[in-house]
Amino acid sequence: PSTMSLLGLVRHMAHVERSWFRRVMAGQDAPYLYRTPEDRDADFNGAVADPAVVEQAWRAWRDEVAFAEQYVDRTPDLSTTGTTRDGSEVQLRDVLVHMIEEYARHCGHADLLRECIDGRVGQ
């Protein structure tokens, strides 16, 4: 069975924002928010209906989006490069396109999950 949930998607997107903008583009050694060597899917597996977990997830996502926005604002050259885990270089423009793809994919997941919960369909 899948562990996908709306909260898991929020946590996952906080992880994705952090990975691409802090770790890859800014070169920070920022710790993972949820992932561990034992559980690469901790962003989904740890998404439980606890108000503190929900609040932390939204706070983390907002913080990571704010960092990404500030990074992009300070980096006018879209050909600026960052280094991925495997040592390859990636340009900021490619990261931005990738983030659009990530959000499009996961917003679609959220739309389907919402429909399963209450029958409402996206507009």
What are these model-derived regions, one by one?
Residues 1-41, 83-123:
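Short, contiguous alpha-helical
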Residues 41-83, 93-99:
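Acidic/histidine-rich alpha-helical segments that form the ligand environment
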